[in-house]
Swiss-Prot record:
It comes from Picrophilus torridus (strain ATCC 700027 / DSM 9790 / JCM 10055 / NBRC 100828 / KAW 2/3). Homodimer. This is dITP/XTP pyrophosphatase. It catalyses: XTP + H2O = XMP + diphosphate + H(+); dITP + H2O = dIMP + diphosphate + H(+); ITP + H2O = IMP + diphosphate + H(+). Substrate binds at residues 5-10, 64, 135-138, 158, 163-164.
Length: 178
């Protein structure tokens, strides 16, 4: 099965997680145009529909957003763009201590149909960056029940709790029934 993403970190997390279920995925490093939708679900579905005409094999894609309560859900599905333009330091300045959550929506093209699976991770925006696993907002996001950022967790630790692993777990359960 192909995982279509231009983000190596997403692929590494998914490959490690799915490997625990003996599911081998191949990375297709491919950029594709995304709509500027209001939800990760909408963006993921639209992208999957476009890609299913280009790629005939089974594949999945992932769209993830960060929703900060004190900013009325901003940046939401625009998380990647905002991270590139504002960066973590400015998010800290705007939202340190705010409740937030990540949402990942996976769209799976399987046997000619599209299926969607989502996962959420709740937490808080930190007052500083920390950790060496520097991927997106991980250095400033402290998951509920932890006193350290996602960037301070190993991939296997992160995969036990993350929004992406929760969505992947639901996808695995779906695939087991097929």
């Amino acid at each position: 099965m192909l995982f279509i993403t231009s983000n190596r970190h997403k692929y590494e997390e998914a490959a490690e997680f799915l490997g625990n279920y003996n599911i081998d995925i191949k990375w297709k490093n491919m950029k594709y145009e995304e709509i500027q939708g209001d939800t990760n679900k909408e963006i993921s579905m639209d992208s999957c529909r476009k890609l299913m005409y280009k790629i005939k094999d089974d594949f999945f894609i992932d769209d993830t957003g960060l929703y900060i309560d004190d900013l009325n859900g901003f940046p939401g599905p625009y998380a990647s763009y905002v991270n590139k333009t504002l960066g973590n330091k400015n998010i800290i300045r705007l939202a340190s201590g705010s409740r937030a959550h990540f949402e990942t929506v996976i769209s799976l093209f399987y046997s000619g149909k599209i299926y969607q699976f989502s996962g959420i991770l709740n937490g808080t925006i930190s007052d500083h960056e920390s950790g060496s696993m520097n991927f997106g907002y991980d250095p400033i996001f402290i998951p509920d029940g932890y006193d350290k950022s996602l960037a301070e967790l190993s991939i296997s630790e992160k995969n036990r709790i993350s929004h992406r692993s929760k969505a992947l777990e639901i996808m695995v359960e779906f695939l087991k029934k097929q």
